[in-house]
Amino acid sequence: MESSMNVREYSNISMIKGPLLMVQGVADSAYNELVEVEMPNGERRRGIVVDSQKGISIVQVFEGTRGISPVGTTVRFLGRGLEVKISEEMLGRIFNPLGDPLDNGPMVIKGEKRDINGEPLNPAIRDYPEEFIQTGISAIDGLNSLLRGQKLPIFSGSGLPANILAAQIAKQATVRGEESNFAVVFGAIGVRYDEALFFRKFFEETGAINRVALIMSLANEPPVMKTLTPKTALTLAEYLAFEQDMHVLAILIDMTNYCEALREISASKEEVPGRGGYPGYMYTDLAQTYERAGKVIGKKGSITQMPILTMPNDDITHPIPDLTGYITEGQITLDRSLYNKGIYPPINVLMSLSRLAKDGIGEGKTRDDHKDLSNQLFAAYAKAVDTRGLAAIIGEDSLSDTDKKYLMFGDAFERKFVSQGVNENRDIETTLDIGWEVLSILPERELTNVKVDYIKKYHPAYRGKK
């Protein structure tokens, strides 16, 4: 039962517009306050306050407003935010953002209720990310490494295999040596039914479901359900990380759906639009979501975040990827031209960046040659791309022998290093060895970014020799 001191009842609904109710005469409602709407027939629905000013509260109803009458309907303001019961029992299960099961399983029995809005970590108690997370994806592990506590988004385009890549990372990612203490919270935001079916089937068939908690909202649900999905997912991640000492990878897909839901809600409230028609507070809203990641001094657990978004028209300057890039620590960019070549995952390493990678690789963390090898692969592939442009102008026959080697390297790099199978889980040693293998196409004099000692130790021409 709700405390009567906190609950206030009103019945003066002035307007119903889309998923919104406008209630007059409310002087003390708070933003994100939980609301219960009781209809004359006894049916109850839940909602939250999305705006409150001049005695008018705007309530967004989770289940929609269809069938709600302004007359005879009671609106109760409950004096608290939306709380969801959180527990370790949610691993291996599928829930909606309100904590209701979607897998025909029982409700969560044990656990504690938590306000899903949470709070970003205090900067003073943050710990710096330094531990390598192995995703099993060479283009990420080898060149744009993910660290425990980092937030590293994936920028995709319409029709590119972001869903498959997200599911593969969720299945394979681990902190080496602490595999049993690793969990994945997968927030699927406004996904189509076929996408929801794919995620569920993939995790169940691969056995990854045992360590994955899936929080899901569908495309046909009200926009508020899409805005709640990452909040509930990150609330669960915070509980697992900071109460159960687990290393949690939070994957949020698709943040573009989240931002579109924000825009839809903003338009319903008739707010003045900002850049691209999105609300002016979208940057703040995204920051509140992305900053719920990191490590805390004195805590064993951590939250690593991989938000995935679709760039409209493949435009990296669009407000959603643009603002995301300001907040996060790099990006993994998927490329349509690579996808059209049959490369999976189609990661454009030259357009990708992990700003913290340098602090989590090298001797004692991955392997001593990792930094030098990464720098050499970047430099060689950049030159290979430039050489392709030159060959398109003057013809391949006019190139020098060295330039022809770079063309061969570029093709081998894409086909052997970047490309891998959906079920191919490469450890970091395998990734680095493949890097050396493709570099061996180039003359040794071209390997200027790698120490001679590493060449003698790892280059295929010397490997195994004393």
UniProtKB/Swiss-Prot annotation:
| Subunit structure of this chain's protein | Has multiple subunits with at least A(3), B(3), C, D, E, F, H, I and proteolipid K(x).
Q: Which family does it belong to?
A: Belongs to the ATPase alpha/beta chains family.
Pfam families, A to Z: ATP-synt_ab, ATP-synt_ab_N, ATP-synt_VA_C
Q: Name one GO molecular function term.
A: proton-transporting ATP synthase activity, rotational mechanism
Q: What is this protein called?
A: A-type ATP synthase subunit B
Q: Which InterPro entries match?
A: ATP-synt_VA_C (IPR055190), ATPase_a/bsu_AS (IPR020003), ATPase_F1/V1/A1_a/bsu_N (IPR004100), ATPase_F1/V1/A1_a/bsu_nucl-bd (IPR000194), P-loop_NTPase (IPR027417), V-ATPase_su_B/beta (IPR022879)
Biological process terms from the Gene Ontology for this record are: proton motive force-driven plasma membrane ATP synthesis
Keywords in alphabetical order: ATP synthesis, Cell membrane, Hydrogen ion transport, Ion transport, Membrane, Transport
Q: What is its main location?
A: membrane
Keyword Ion transport found: yes
What is the native source organism of this protein?
Answer: Metallosphaera sedula (strain ATCC 51363 / DSM 5348 / JCM 9185 / NBRC 15509 / TH2)
